């Protein structure tokens, strides 16, 4: 599942990092987008492993509504993260929402036992509005992380979460 807001207005914003990563995975693995329950979905095959790319058609704060019938242990949730420097990609299993309303909605639906691929967008400048920042256009460093975040999703699917964490969470 890639977190983001629907519509062109939000397509290139920091908060839509999750949607951008799913678009990259779709570009790599093909498939066809179809309308599913409260989401757009595409079935793809990654190294012989079937996966469903799911982009909620709801706004961020209601992202969990698209998860009817899914279990936490079957999910990889890709999302923007203010607490990581722009361009950083990290893999994590479990944890809280950390102030992210999309994650809060997902956790309220399925619990917190899912894998996360976190795309760093950095913090806004001192005194700047956080909402305006996350809904602002993604900068170059964060955009360049999108293919690496797609690599991280593929690594989770192919090698498992532990191996993906070892690979993507290593300090450079």
Swiss-Prot record:
GO terms for molecular function: peptidyl-tRNA hydrolase activity; tRNA binding. One of its GO terms (biological process) is protein quality control for misfolded or incompletely synthesized proteins. Pfam families: Pept_tRNA_hydro. CDD domains: PTH (cd00462). It catalyses: an N-acyl-L-alpha-aminoacyl-tRNA + H2O = an N-acyl-L-amino acid + a tRNA + H(+). The record marks 5 as: Discriminates between blocked and unblocked aminoacyl-tRNA. It is found in: Cytoplasm. InterPro entries: Pept_tRNA_hydro, Pept_tRNA_hydro_CS, Pept_tRNA_hydro_sf. TRNA binds at residues 10, 59, 61, 101. PANTHER family: PEPTIDYL-TRNA HYDROLASE. Monomer. This is Peptidyl-tRNA hydrolase. It comes from Rubrobacter xylanophilus (strain DSM 9941 / JCM 11954 / NBRC 16129 / PRD-1).
